Amino acid sequence: WKTLNGCPTCRPAINFYLLAEWPLDYQDDAQSRFVNERNHANIQKDGTYSVMPRMWGGMTTPDELLAIAAAAKKYDAAVKVTGGQRIDLLGVKKEDLPAIWADLNAAGMVSGHAYSKGLRTVKTCVGTDWCRFGTQDSTGLGIKLEKKLWGSWTPHKVKLGVSGCPRNCAEATCKDVGVVCVDSGYQIGVAGAAGMDVRETQRLVDVASEEEAIEWTAAFVQLYREHAKYLDRPYKWVDKVGLDWVKEVLSDPAERAALNERFEISQSVYRKDPWAEHASEPEAEKFQPLADLTMEPAE
């Protein structure tokens, strides 16, 4: 390092490698994170923040929608429906973040981690519950995957999709991990992208049950966590190591089980809501503006 405190490139990378390798021993260093991760919200061009609660598998309830509407009115936020099947509250002042988090927590909602290098969304279609073309319960599987993976830290953001049939309404074939349901089970693809680079997923495996789909997905995410360079999206990592190597590792049942076990050890530390942790004192004080100590001249 060229300075005593390191640099803004190295510190976030080293912080991630340490928390991924030794989750039970290493304490996350908040000062080694990007500003959005430190503040648990995305800073906008005008200095305000966006707040996005998690909606499991794209599902919500009337009570959650009422809470979101109340928060939008209370904090004068713009309301935007996102492509990830969530609702974004835009224009929230930094000093209001703990309060809006507390209000959303009171309605049972947690952080959507829209700012994180970790799991973002699991986009789903309606599946067999409502769609006449659905082959499996894609919504239910998406919710299970999101509840297993949420809170995890990864080298870069991770997005999932679960489509109930090959018509692919959830756009699973351009996600980091995409599951396409078919009559015989589940087709799992990886290393897709829909940003500046557009990539179709590559077929990882076909499985017959939900349990297998969840096992393979979590194992893939953990393998990515352990082997990818910081800030490499899954498609860039797979390009480097090769899909054949990924398949070879994950095809071993013992290795899949070990990867799942290590993932759960990490999740025992990080599967928690940062909004709840920072919505009350003394953490909430960190979001207050600097005091105005201007002194009036003496008479």
Briefly describe each language-model feature range.
Residues 6, 24, 35-43:
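Accessory DNA-engaging acidic/polar modules
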Residues 13-15, 24-28, 43, 47-187, ...:
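Small-residue-enriched alpha-helical segments and adjacent helix-cap loops
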Residues 110-111, 145, 185, 222-233, ...:
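Conserved C-terminal portion of the radical SAM core fold
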Residues 1-15:
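Compact, charge-rich alpha-helical regulatory domains located at protein termini
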Residues 251-286:
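Acidic, Ser/Thr-rich low-complexity intrinsically disordered segments
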Residues 23, 27, 77-81, 154-155, ...:
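Intrinsically disordered or highly flexible coil/loop and linker segments, enriched in small
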Residues 159, 164, 168, 173-233:
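Mobile "lid/hinge" segments at catalytic clefts and subdomain interfaces of large enzymes
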